[in-house]
Amino acid sequence: MIIYLHGFDSTSPGNHEKVLQLQFIDEDVRLISYSTLHPRHDMQHLLKQVDKMIQHSDDDRSLICGVGLGGFWAERVGFLCDIRQVIVNPNLFPQENMSGKIDRPEEYLDIATKCVANFREKNRDRCMVMLSRQDEMLDSQRSAQTLGEYYEIVWDDIQTHKFKSISPHLQRIKAFKTLG
């Protein structure tokens, strides 16, 4: 099972396209929708939904995949639910760049600092990061510096922030998922 978390633009047709692409490596791909506007509520909702999906799945190597803001959530929720994560152009600092787009961007900082102390150290090698060199929204180098000590970084030279095509990376994602 692969759980897919969309980014801030939840209505983008690219979400459906990525779900279809992920179905090439696992036919059971489930999209969880969340508000994107209320971080604390989103955290509770995502934890509850992901836990329920894991409990009702017979796949002992489930994976959570998130793009952009979904990457912020996938890393944390995947860690808390003990499943591997693939995060694509993750928005690691939404409290800095979501101001004016959501009600309480400062809640992201609160969530980030209250997760689990040193959670990335405890999550070492259980997350794969895909970054685009052409990301027009986020600073990919900053993301690489923040995450590179803990996780494998996969660079893409073609895709933009929304990472429309993950197809060239499907075999790598599949291999990462099978590690359980």
Curated annotation (Swiss-Prot):
InterPro entries: AB_hydrolase_fold (IPR029058), UPF0227 (IPR022987), UPF0227/Esterase_YqiA (IPR008886). Belongs to the UPF0227 family. It comes from Pectobacterium atrosepticum (strain SCRI 1043 / ATCC BAA-672) (Erwinia carotovora subsp. atroseptica). Transmembrane segments: none annotated. HAMAP family: UPF0227 (MF_01047). It holds the Pfam family UPF0227. This is UPF0227 protein ECA1814. It comes from the Bacteria.
